[in-house]
């Protein structure tokens, strides 16, 4: 069934993020800049990618007033904030001290662009925003990887190895940030186990033991985890 429409963007189409960017540049970006100059009493920042965005404030009062103003702004375009994805949290250099004084436990975390962001420190004790692979993203990507390995199960091992190596390099290129070494190693470990499982399933007479598989990896090593985005302040 097909029906023409002049509203919205094609779901899943490559042009949809571009159209969303153009629309939100006017509906959100420019408006936030104007609000910041006109109404903010402290520092604030906007970070946006497509329709995911993050607003940071120096002062809680600004955040509260922006929450009201933003809802009104989006309503003019027939939009509203996603209730499950919209939160106002205390985060930053003084969050841990403030929450400890109020007996509220550790600072909350937030997810943005595939990372879970949380308050941490550098090796010399300075505040630093730490990032780790978002748990849901990791689970989903590993599931997709296992499904693709199953589909490629009967390809030559050399072709499987080449494909998996490219997947790992792409993962490191995006998620290889300071403080996320554990997340990279975990992805590699699970990817290796998934590949071994796929090879074992295709062997009818002689299954691939771990000894044979480890010998295969020594002869054809997979790319090791590497950080692609390193900040000067080393994570603790």
Regions inferred by a protein language model and the residue ranges of each:
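Non-catalytic terminal/accessory segments
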Residues: 1-236
